Amino acid sequence: MNKTPVPISFAEKFDCFTEQWSPKVVAEMNDYQFKLVRLEGDFVWHDHQDTDETFIVLEGTLLIDFQDGTVELEAGQMLVVPKGVPHRPRASAEAKVL
């Protein structure tokens, strides 16, 4: 059995689906899952009581609304939303996010 890790191509993985707001698991490590997602339009206001949430923008622009303002993320930027903090991600055009 080969134990050499194989690189994961984000482009190839994104080519496998077109659905919006439907994260796809592309890798797992310990207790973590790495998910790719296509985002366009507005999501609902929500929070995560048990875990932080990370957004890494690979392509496009992602806006994340908070109760006291909005953060704009461009390709190559990352944001960690602390657990329990209400937020709403949105994108006026498709953004590809890890």
Please report, for each region that a protein language model flagged, where it lies by residue.
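Short, conserved beta-strand element in jelly-roll/cupin
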Residues: R38-E40, H48-D65
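A short, N-terminal "cap"/entry segment at the start of jelly-roll beta-barrel domains
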Residues: M1-K35
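A cytosolic small-molecule/anion-sensing beta-strand core signal
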Residues: N30, L58-E59, E74-A75, A93
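Conserved short histidine dyad/triad with adjacent acidic residue
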Residues: E19-Q20, Q33-Q49
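Ligand-binding loop in jelly-roll beta-barrel domains
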Residues: K83-L98
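Short acidic-glycine-tyrosine-enriched beta hairpin
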Residues: Q67-K83
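Short, charged/polar surface micro-motifs in flexible loops or helix N-caps
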Residues: D31-Q33, E40-D42, T61-L63, T70
